[in-house]
Amino acid sequence: MSDLCGGLPPDICEQLTKEEQFIKIKVEKRRYGKEVTIVEGISNDETELKKIASELKSKLAAGGTVKNGKIELQGDHRDRVKELLIKMGFPESNILVIE
């Protein structure tokens, strides 16, 4: 990551990266009427996605996974996910909740 930030301190670099991301949160119906919350657009870094997914699953008490660069959480958690992402430092203006 230091290569991308041109010598900026890591915390400033991390904040800049979060501000550049446009995040979409939506719910899909799967088999047997089960709902899955999809969070996309966060990061292309698999380890970063897994870390965020783990924190979301823990806070929401829900199962989930990371697939194809997206976080999938069991159940409809759109509004709560948005709140948690804002607390993690993502700007509210870059988070779109699709109804």
From Swiss-Prot:
GO terms for biological process: formation of translation preinitiation complex; regulation of translation; translation reinitiation. SUPFAM superfamilies: eIF1-like. InterPro entries: DENR/SUI1_TIF, SUI1, SUI1_arc, SUI1_arc_bac, SUI1_dom_sf. GO terms for molecular function: mRNA binding; translation initiation factor activity. Keywords: Protein biosynthesis, Translation regulation. PANTHER family: DENSITY-REGULATED PROTEIN, DENSITY-REGULATED PROTEIN HOMOLOG. NCBIfam families: PRK00939.1 (NF002096), SUI1_rel (TIGR01158). Belongs to the SUI1 family. This is Protein translation factor SUI1 homolog. It comes from Sulfolobus acidocaldarius (strain ATCC 33909 / DSM 639 / JCM 8929 / NBRC 15157 / NCIMB 11770).
